[in-house]
Regions:
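Conserved acidic donor-binding segment of nucleotide-sugar-dependent glycosyltransferases
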Residues: 321, 325-332, 341-346
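Short alpha-helical donor nucleotide-sugar binding micro-motif in glycosyltransferases
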Residues: 139, 268-269, 276-281
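Short hydrophobic beta-strand element within catalytic cores of glycosyltransferases
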Residues: 297, 306-309
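Aromatic "clamp/platform" in nucleotide-sugar-dependent glycosyltransferases that forms part
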Residues: 289
Length: 387
């Protein structure tokens, strides 16, 4: 077996989906014997809150302008400046996002590297002309595009006329498990989780997480279950959703949903505490309107939680109606009814039993092997073009 030197690039050290994908893929490739180094923009100087057995290199990121176009431009240049000085040479340069892909495209243009791979987790609908150009360039200039779901594979083909082979996401069963480790009670006390039932979602407050409709649905649930609690964890994001957040909190005030009592907002949860947090909940609710895949859904299932999620791709690519309660993300009433149903013992028990079978299919080892197949093809193609 040929062993490769692989550079994986990600735009952040915060635990967003594509960042976790990068880190878990790196670990899996490392375990298969390949040398992997993760390059990540580190805007707060804190690095990863993640234990890694493979190398990583933190790319210094300075305070950026408020204007999003200028911010993205600066982040791309920070990557370019840092990578231009590297002495290390890799067989594969693999970007997991628009920012790092644009940086690699510049390095190809400057003839510092010969090619790069880009994983497209999803396509954004940018209102900014500059951001749309960045996204287009990150896709069109890549020598190989990969994607993580059938729905985005079709959309990439439709919008860009590019075939992006599909690779899978995975879930780390060494981290996410229904087996308690004795720290659940202390975390519940720390966060003020004394109610019942406890609903959890991960991803923060933002439009595509459908946070406002989830809050409206939770308001209905509180009428029947006044001691219920909704935990919205996470929230690290590159974009400013302040207007949406203001609307969210105004709604909470109108519905008299008290923060710290019924609504728990722990923010970004540490890598060590996240698996424990899943185990404190009674159900996982994720009525997202747009996802590349939905890693947190797999994490919740691995943690033994019954799941409510949207009745649309990509969720319907790996979940059936017997494995999760699939609801219209546009219907507050449907979300609320599912939240009432999912805590019924016969419903939750069946969902948990039926959903466990998907975990063996979605492993990071399987994902790494799929990546290696495409890496090998790409390396062969580049060598053929050179010689």
């Amino acid at each position: 077996m040929t062993l490769y030197r692989i550079a994986l690039l990600t735009y952040s050290t915060e635990p967003r989906g594509s960042v976790i994908h990068t880190l878990e893929l790196a670990e899996a490739l490392h375990k298969l014997g390949h040398y992997v180094c993760v390059y990540a923009l580190d805007k707060d100087g804190k690095g990863f809150d993640y234990t890694s057995s493979c190398d990583y290199d933190l790319v210094p990121a300075q305070a950026a302008p408020i204007d999003i176009d200028q911010l993205i431009q600066q982040r791309i240049q920070e990557f370019v400046s840092y990578l231009s000085q590297l002495q290390s040479v890799y067989d594969v340069y693999h970007a997991q996002d628009c920012i790092s892909a644009n940086a690699l495209a510049k390095l190809v243009q400057q003839q510092q590297i010969s090619s790069f791979v880009r994983t497209i987790h999803h396509i954004e609908d940018y209102s900014s002309h500059y951001l749309q150009q960045c996204q287009d360039r990150s896709i069109r200039n890549a020598n190989l595009c990969l994607c993580v779901s059938d729905c985005w594979q079709k959309e990439i083909q439709r919008q860009y006329r590019i075939h992006a082979p599909r690779v899978i996401n995975g879930v780390n069963l060494e981290r996410f498990s229904p087996i308690a480790n004795g720290l659940e009670s202390s975390l519940k006390e720390q966060l003020g989780l004394s109610g019942s039932p406890i609903y959890l979602t991960v991803g923060g407050i933002e439009p595509r997480k459908n946070s406002i409709r989830l809050l409206q649905a939770f308001g209905q649930v509180l009428e029947d279950y006044p001691t219920a609690q909704l935990v919205i964890a996470g929230g690290a994001t590159l974009f400013d959703y302040q207007t949406y957040r203001d609307d969210f909190f105004a709604l909470a005030d109108r519905l008299d949903i008290q923060i710290g009592r019924s609504l728990i907002l722990p923010g970004v949860v540490s890598d060590a505490e996240l698996p424990i947090l899943y185990r404190t909940a009674d159900a996982f609710v994720f009525p997202s309107t747009k996802e590349g895949w939905g890693l947190v859904v797999l994490e919740a299932i691995a943690s033994g939680l019954p799941v409510i999620t949207s009745n649309q791709p990509p969720f319907t690519e790996f979940l059936s109606e017997t494995q999760a309660l699939l609801v219209s993300p546009d219907s507050t009433d449907a979300i609320a009814q599912a939240m009432r149903s999912v805590i019924q013992p016969n419903v939750s028990r069946l969902l948990m039993q039926q959903s466990q079978s998907i975990l063996s299919r979605y492993t990071w080892e399987n994902s790494a092997k799929m990546h290696l197949h495409y890496y090998q093809n790409q390396i062969t193609n580049i060598k053929t073009e050179l010689y």
